[in-house]
Amino acid sequence: MSSAPHDPFYSSPFGPFYRRHTPYMVQPEYRIYEMNKRLQARSEDSDNLWWDAFATEFFEDDATLTLSFCLEDGPKRYTIGRTLIPRYFSTVFEGGVTDLYYILKHSKESYHNSSITVDCDQCTMVTQHGKPMFTKVCTEGRLILEFTFDDLMRIKTWHFTIRQYRELVPRSILPMHAQDPQVLEQLSKNITRMGLTNFTLNYLRLCVILEPMQELMSRHKTYNLSPRDCLKTCLFQKWQRMVAPPAEPTRQPTTKRRKRKNSTSSTSNSSAGNNANSTNSKKKSAAANLSLSSQDVMVVGEPTLMGGEFGDEDERLITRLENTQYDAANGMDDEEDFNNSPALGNNSPWNSKPPANQETKSENPTPQASQ
């Protein structure tokens, strides 16, 4: 029995040299799974440094966390910044919660240039409460997450809209306290409000005051100013931003027409035709036909295509440019040399002169030889 050919690049996972797989982008839902594992690894004596490290691992520096729900007195919406997110998660456990994790079902992912959006309409936040009695609370709602599209894949925006919640009590507890009406009454009361403890709700209400004061506290810590001076400085800067004139909208640069330069051949032909005539006839023809000064040059622009502006029947735009380097008397001294050129024979077409009544600009610029 012949054995399979040995692959020199194959490395057994059980051998001493195990080859790792090629790294790939982590799925957004897996980041939530990693966050659940990190929350389960929390100890009872976790300090603020642990919560700051937790927020740094899973949240961007400019991340925001928003909670929307409806209480007895109306709908509520709380949004906190990155500096207050660690404290929010710590208040959940300080309110009597022993375990916290999130379950995402049928989530939809959409990829953008610099972010990944996860929209889960069936998200459940599960919390285990040990006080005053063992209770499992399932808070259902819609969770919308925005991750940064990079290697860290941290959360940029967190928006959890709570629809309903359920508090589950073990059935085995009821027979144990069937004869105690006070315990049964206590079991019938809810220990949370829309799945959130009173400790967390009080912190969210406090964040409404703390969030605008972040600038004051940061300025006080940086410049060591008194609270009154910090407030004056912040109000003055806010007033400056309000009275500052609005920025002018950027104007789009106007597209310039491309000018067609005079070719060398046309320049040589025109100079040869002009030198064939005498000095007096050249001045008269220039004055009669063009009537331009010696320093003006007529330039014909190309018609603009591909969505540009068109003139009447696509006429070319003629622009007058001033040529300071042009000298009308230049080349007059070479007239004698040109007339004595051997190219001007008796039957040469260059030696024949056009009729006097023929204009310089004609539809057929090539002169016919006189018979």
UniProtKB/Swiss-Prot annotation:
Name under which the protein is recorded: LIM domain-binding protein 2
Gene3D superfamilies: Cysteine Rich Protein
Family annotation (InterPro entries): LID, LIM-bd/SEUSS
GO molecular function: LIM domain binding; transcription coregulator activity
Name of the gene: LDB2
Protein's cellular compartments: Nucleus
Family designation: Belongs to the LDB family.
Tissue: First expressed at stages 15-16 in presumptive limb mesoderm. As limb outgrowth proceeds, expressed in the entire limb bud, concentrating in the distal mesoderm throughout limb development. Both hindlimbs and forelimbs exhibit similar expression patterns.
Keywords assigned: Nucleus
Low complexity compositional bias, start-end: 263-289
Function according to Swiss-Prot or TrEMBL: Binds to the LIM domain of a wide variety of LIM domain-containing transcription factors.
Pfam families: LID, LIM_bind
GO CC terms of this entry: nucleus; transcription regulator complex
Biased composition (Polar residues): 339-371
Segments for region (Disordered): 244-289, 325-371
GO aspect biological process, one term: negative regulation of transcription by RNA polymerase II
LIM interaction domain (LID) domain segment(s): 296-335
